[in-house]
Amino acid sequence: MESRGCAALWVLLLAQVSEQQTPACALGLAAAASGSPEDPQPPPFSGSSWLETGEYDLVSAYEVDHRGDYVSHDIMHYQRRRRRRAVTQPGGDALHLRLKGPRHDLHLDLKAASNLMAPGFMVQTLGKGGTKSVQMFPPEENCFYQGSLRSQGNSSVALSTCQGLLGMIRTKDTDYFLKPLPPHLTSKLNRSAQGDSPSHVLYKRSTERQAPRENEVLMITRKRDLARPHLHHDNFHLGPSQKQHFCGRRKKYMPQPPNDDLYILPDEYKPSSRHKRSLLKSHRNEELNVETLVVVDRKMMQSHGHENITTYVLTILNMVSALFKDGTIGGNINIVIVGLILLEDEQPGLAISHHADHTLTSFCQWQSGLMGKDGTRHDHAILLTGLDICSWKNEPCDTLGFAPISGMCSKYRSCTVNEDSGLGLAFTIAHESGHNFGMVHDGEGNMCKKSEGNIMSPTLAGRNGVFSWSSCSRQYLHKFLSTAQAICLADQPKPVKEYKYPEKLPGQLYDANTQCKWQFGEKAKLCMLDFRKDICKALWCHRIGRKCETKFMPAAEGTLCGQDMWCRGGQCVKYGDEGPKPTHGHWSDWSPWSPCSRTCGGGISHRDRLCTNPRPSHGGKFCQGSTRTLKLCNSQRCPLDSVDFRAAQCAEYNSKRFRGWLYKWKPYTQLEDQDLCKLYCIAEGFDFFFSLSNKVKDGTPCSEDSRNVCIDGMCERVGCDNVLGSDATEDSCGVCKGNNSDCVTHRGLYSKHHSTNQYYHMVTIPSGARSIHIYETNISTSYISVRNSLKRYYLNGHWSVDWPGRYKFSGATFNYKRSYKEPENLTSPGPTNETLIVELLFQGRNPGVAWEFSLPRSGAKKTPAAQPSYSWAIVRSECSVSCGGGKMNSKAGCYRDLKVPVNASFCNPKTRPVTGLVPCKVSPCPSSWSVGNWSVCSRTCGGGTQSRPVRCTRRAHYRDESIPASLCPQPEPPIHQACNSQSCPPAWSTGPWAECSRTCGKGWRKRTVACKSTNPSARAQLLHDTACTSEPKPRTHEICLLKRCHKHKKLQWLVSAWSQCSVTCQGGTQQRVLRCAEKYISGKYRELASKKCLHLPKPDLELERACGLIPCPKHPPFDASGSPRGSWFASPWSQCTASCGGGVQRRTVQCLLRGQPASDCFLHEKPETSSACNTHFCPIAEKRGTFCKDLFHWCYLVPQHGMCGHRFYSKQCCNTCSKSNL
């Protein structure tokens, strides 16, 4: 039990942190027993200190021997070195540690990570002017260890002992981080602790963002707020503050190499010179070595300090190395650091910013120019930055890393950028390096789930706190290692041994109730409400007043799960049983040999076996050795008229459209070594070539003059004994595995000087010569020339200089090299079939030309020279098509011994064969889908559809024929597809017209017009009218003309307006009258005599009403002071503004006293200043047989000047005036 004093001090120091609650989204870890996601539980750690959560444990660390007996508390590396010098200890580099705390008692069996750093590893510091310092890192300073926990299967440990214990402990249940406590905190805890004083803090990886760091604890002791560390993707939280992994860049880019003056030649390391690596075998499960260069930027240097940064970075990489040795990866990957570069200042050509994409591009280009002084290069480069990076902008955001996919071993793409986030940085590096190995995120284009808690999950959130490699990651890695690109990883590291001893299990020390308290607080207990729950798979706990909940973490090994039962390996078994032990994988039987890939010329056959007998499980090891074996088959020569195997593969694409066009393809062979096994073809008649396939068919020769063959995209060695992988070679005499005893090598030097621009004989090489080598001893301006005895020049003849390259003549292949910085060189393995004369085209000074060749010994057994035979042979061109019927041109050629073409005069002209066009490739082509052009999209925006004709066809007998769709490859190409998915601009939406305001004659009708979004894939939304200003707004009103109204329906009673009140106060009256009127179609009324409307019922309306009901004020003619008061005076009414139809008349009203303006009149007594007048209807003259029209073009001005009431204007402008009265 922990002492109360220690716990109290810890709670006091971390009081402020304990007030912070776990984000609500962390509840995704604790599921209620009911399983309802809508019923979230409160955070399990609310209101309690860190120590009470069970996520943290203060442990005491000390060294023990292999038996577990105490050795010393001095565990730091320099202390152990001093102690080992004083006392010889058994075990060599083995280290045994004990971590003991209130909740954990762990025994660590470790071994020095001797292969973490390459021989000659150095740390280089770069400043503005270049290298500032180079620090050697001798092997005895290696303070990094890897190993496992004793008696805990499937566990791993990666720690450094440089300055206390720092690193990672992985169990099958969860991942832990271990850190030393700061010295000032250690001393305080030591004064309050009883027994072993705690020196380290052990906490789960899922809580790292809350873990105490040295500067944070110092800030807390000063009663300041805890500085919030960077969030990263190893948090379980899914809230807005979570760091997401915007990484794994699929963009296949190739940055331009930097200029020569920007290349940096660092001397931070001097690794041992590599031997020439053998080619990596396909499908081999061998130990692979990733030689890694680590670069640390200035921001991260400032954060950790120059004195601590090396230890910190190597500790992180030691953890990364352990992650890549995890058994779930399905391979043996060793991370070996070949150099560490510390950037104290900005470097030319390297731009590091918040923008992760730009930083990655710059770093990949910059590191491509780095190499050791001995010319060695790293396989992989890692940039560690202290900046808060973002994948898409130059501002801080939630990105943790960035990397190209499948960039490993590439000079320009084997690089990653990683943001420093504490010890969790190791998982970021492993994740991004996984992308470089060709891995993509789980759940993105594969069958693995995002939430399974694997290292390649889009967001690093462990399952039960444990992180592993998914089956998809294993497949991606296996696929990458089977390519030629992985050749840089062929180095083999030394294996690391592990110790395993029996010991008491954690579940025996801490029962299920105690484990619940650690996870959910002091009041939590094992949930006993549902006995069907298996605590060996998920520990279910409950607190008072709450439902059962779990973090989906199994109970610890050895926990009691029933009567005489305990948990072992996730299963509840009888007490004493070990449960499922680690099962190591074993190979299945070999499969039968596959059919040969070629019928002649040397094909490939293979057989496979799987690691399934049984599969590795419960921490078992993966099978060692090869999953596939290969052998050559059908090695006999192909007939002389057969088509070249590589040319046949190119011809297969003649019937396939390339960017919309058909071409005739021929092999393009001027390739770099890494591209020999890619199918590069050049379009006949054009000057471009293209890689039509990333690998040729198995058995294709790597090059024309090589026995090596391509297998699964890699060039594999074939010996002269025709055995795959054999190192057998021919000696100078052409004898396979010979010792040069059957021939004599002739050597000489030609150093004469002559006049320039002439050919001079140097040496004559007889027929049958082998191992020919002619070379300049120094660079000169002269040229080596070769001809036969008949003065036919094959190289540099007739004062014409040929390009360097491969040349075939005299029955042999010659390799001609000429460079401006190297001497001229001509080589050939031979043998030649005619005498060759080597000459020198003399140009200036002759530094000397050396030559050598081999001839059979005179005493060797010779066979009499056979007389040459001359015969005709038909040489056919390639078929115009690869199938379905084509034509090829045939011509006759004269050959010596059916090998060497000679002049036609050597052959009998009477036996010359008939030549011309002949049919070829008449066999039907494979069925394929014939697709037409897409139709016009049904919509211009907002998501439409388009279709195209698709039919299954096969070319046979020179024409295309339709066949059933079932005979074509499935699935069928899509017939329909979406198109124009971009959002549509807003537009005016019109509603239906309402009914006309009239039932007959002329009226008005209305409709609604609104601006709406027109995207059919989303719900229409009303927008402001300003959003539709790009097009005019439709009308909302329009005139409607109906049938002519009947005469009798025009008559109606109209009521006039109320007249003015007869008095201003004290009881007056107002009147209005009913008049008979006739309404025209135009809407204008005409007053008629009342008798014409007698047949119509009068409306029941009040025609008189009282008004002026306000009492008249009673006031003296004088004011309160006895002075006289002013009175209101009104002028006569003005003339009415209209003679009919309603007008207005006005008058002036003033307050006067004795003829002078005054201001003391009562406002309520003020008379009206305006009044309605002439409210009767205007008469309309109607003449039979005429119609209303305008007689002048200026009639539109009449109503604007109010002249329609004038008799002349109303008559001459009848139409305009009638409309103005509407």
From Swiss-Prot:
Cofactor(s) this protein requires: Zn(2+)
Signal sequence, renumbered to the chain: 1-20
Post-translational changes noted in the entry: The precursor is cleaved by a furin endopeptidase.
Keyword presence, Glycoprotein: yes
Disulfide bond annotation, renumbered to this chain: C364-C415, C390-C397, C409-C488, C448-C472, C516-C541, C527-C548, C536-C567, C561-C572, C596-C633, C600-C638, C611-C623
Peptidase M12B domain boundaries: 288-493
Propeptide: 21-277
Annotated ranges, domain Disintegrin: 494-583
BP-aspect Gene Ontology terms: branching involved in ureteric bud morphogenesis; extracellular matrix organization; male gamete generation; proteolysis; regulation of cilium assembly; regulation of systemic arterial blood pressure
Domain of life: Eukaryota
Cofactor info, note text: Binds 1 zinc ion per subunit.
Stretches for region Spacer: 745-871
Record domain PLAC: where: 1184-1221
Pfam families in the record: ADAMTS_CR_2 (PF17771), ADAMTS_CR_3 (PF19236), ADAMTS_spacer1 (PF05986), Pep_M12B_propep (PF01562), PLAC (PF08686), Reprolysin (PF01421), TSP1_ADAMTS (PF19030), TSP_1 (PF00090)
Active site residues of this protein: E432
Glycosylation sites: N154, N190, N308, N739, N778, N825, N833, N903, N933
Domain TSP type-1 intervals: 584-639, 872-920, 925-985, 986-1046, 1049-1113, 1125-1179
Record keywords: Cleavage on pair of basic residues, Disulfide bond, Extracellular matrix, Glycoprotein, Hydrolase, Metal-binding, Metalloprotease, Protease, Repeat, Secreted, Signal, Zinc, Zymogen
Residues annotated for Zn(2+) binding in this entry: C247, H431, H435, H441
GO CC annotations, alphabetized: extracellular region
InterPro entries: ADAMTS/ADAMTS-like, ADAMTS_ADAMTS-like, ADAMTS_CR_2, ADAMTS_CR_3, ADAMTS_spacer1, MetalloPept_cat_dom_sf, Peptidase_M12B, Peptidase_M12B_N
Compartment(s) where it occurs, according to its Swiss-Prot or TrEMBL record: Secreted, Extracellular space, Extracellular matrix
Enzyme Commission (EC) number: 3.4.24.-
SUPFAM superfamilies: Metalloproteases ('zincins'), catalytic domain, TSP-1 type 1 repeat
Domain notes: The spacer domain and the TSP type-1 domains are important for a tight interaction with the extracellular matrix.
Protein name: A disintegrin and metalloproteinase with thrombospondin motifs 16
Species per Swiss-Prot/TrEMBL record: Mus musculus
Gene: Adamts16
